[in-house]
Amino acid sequence: FSIGAAYSDLDFSTKGTETTSGVATVNNETTTKTGSGDLGSIFVEYTFAQGSTIGLDYIDGTAEIGKATRTSSTPSGDVTASASVSDPLTFYVEPTFMLTDTFGVYAKGGVTQLTVTPKEVDTASVVTSSYKAKDLNGVVTGFGAKFYMGNFFAKAEYLETEFDTYVHQSTTGTNAIIRADIDTEQTIFALGYNF
């Protein structure tokens, strides 16, 4: 049984499309945003005698993954749309090949869940469309290496995550429909302790 903490350099790509309804014309607004951020997480895991591992990783917090401004006549002025994600929880497995007693390499796979919350406001800071916060699932794949030092260990890994598409219709304002696709890439460094 092990516990640890990890630092992650996260790159994300978010592609969103908003379709407005209930107006004279139907507008489709599409934007793609990329960005990066630093995240910290905690994890618990169990390592088998052979070296392979199963575990859970949790990030406590919220991060903005996209923001764009467009000019609209309904409502008038600029409209700023944004989306944030919060509290990712990941279950993972690490099939491991130990090259020595203290050093091994592994493939990593798993599933993750997080909450996505989009919204948009106009120039008067009035919410023009509000969307339901929704849990999305994602598939995690990657690879890494681990090194043991007594009861301590260190890991370095690269991960990619592809999430389900977020789809929801606003219950206010223009009753717009939003669709968003989120993909992430992570470089992670972790330290842990074996009990």
PLM feature segments, named:
Residues 1-195:
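Gram-negative outer-membrane beta-barrel domains
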